[in-house]
Amino acid sequence: MVTFLKLREWQEKAFPLWWEKKRGIIKVVTGGGKTFFAIHCLKRYLENDPQKSILIVVPSIALLDQWYDSLSQNFDDKEISLNGGGEQTKIITKICISTIDSLKNIISLIDAEKTLLIVDECHKIGTEKRGEMLTNAWHATLGLSATPERDYDDNFYIIIKKILGDIIFDYDYIDAREDEVIVNFKLLYGYAALLPEEENKYKKFTKSIQRRAATIGGQDMNDYPLKMLIFNRARLVKNSKNRIPYGIELIQKYERDSWIVFTENKKQAKEFNKIVNKLKGFNSGIYNTDLNDDERQENLEKFKAGNLNVLVSCTALDEGFDMPEADGAMILSASSSKRQRIQRMGRVLRITANKENALIVTVYSSKTEYEKLREESNRYKLEGVPVKWQQMSL
């Protein structure tokens, strides 16, 4: 007999919307309980027809492991097979969990017409190559993401929506905060000024962008020269030299039990980690692909156990991975996409017994970053989220 655990209020509302057609995308804030919701859906699906199967597609090995841990509490291990991260199944069991990049090894073994397809972090399937693997006649579909829409292309409509269906339920930060599903949080925006030579280059790029846009009659991102000017200006800002010292200043000023720090690249991560480890009271580690699987796992376990109180990453912790221990997040580049910012904020908003609130710090260095953040801050302020702006004292 399948046991059904008590659903949260939003899950009670969302389930019948999905069950009616057994198709659609659930847009849920990170930490809101989308995995729990999906497990409830697949349990009901299998109870309704035990002859059916489940395929769960995830973007990373970390999420593969997390899904396995959650499902193994609800199903016999013999019913679950893994594909990805060194595991390659040859027999499709009742429930199969696969990373996106390993899916090609087993997709021909799946009977789509008898399968519920669940795609976690479903914005990740929005490429032509990945989409092609999943354009089957699935019996049922369920997409999960805090950010299903994509910032820089129309592939949500062209690819993702065609495979999984419409967004049928939206549960955002404000809803989750009101329902006490996530902790209360504060936002701090810190201005790390460009150095004089960086400021001069920034102004030159901006003038060149304006001239090119005037020449072609607007900001057409298909225009390669314009695209490269914008790219090079963004790279200048992302790598501005004051970001790291200001981040170090802030991490010392605002006391937190533990921090996750998101840098722009591996070089920044290495430099930030090196400096923090010289500070009294801080033990820092890195989590990125420069480390092997065992080293990354070791640093995660140390962080969870409290032996590290700072974990520095580039993009490896962006999506899906549970880090409830952290109550501070620092985003060293405000130029990241809206989707990426939401994912990163979500890393520290999960409720734990001793967490009173979370602090999310974003460092910015340019007018373009400021304008984007000002719009975000105004939206959160209207909902009662404490917001503070300051600039570096160095």
Descriptions of predicted regions:
Residues 124-185:
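Post-DEXD/H (motif II) to motif III coupling segment of the RecA-like Helicase ATP-binding lobe
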Residues 114-115, 310-314, 318-335, 340, ...:
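A short beta-strand element within the Helicase C-terminal
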Residues 22-25, 170-259, 264, 272-277:
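Interdomain linker/hinge connecting the two RecA-like lobes of the SF2 helicase core
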Residues 173-183, 336-345, 350-394:
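A conserved SF2-helicase RecA2
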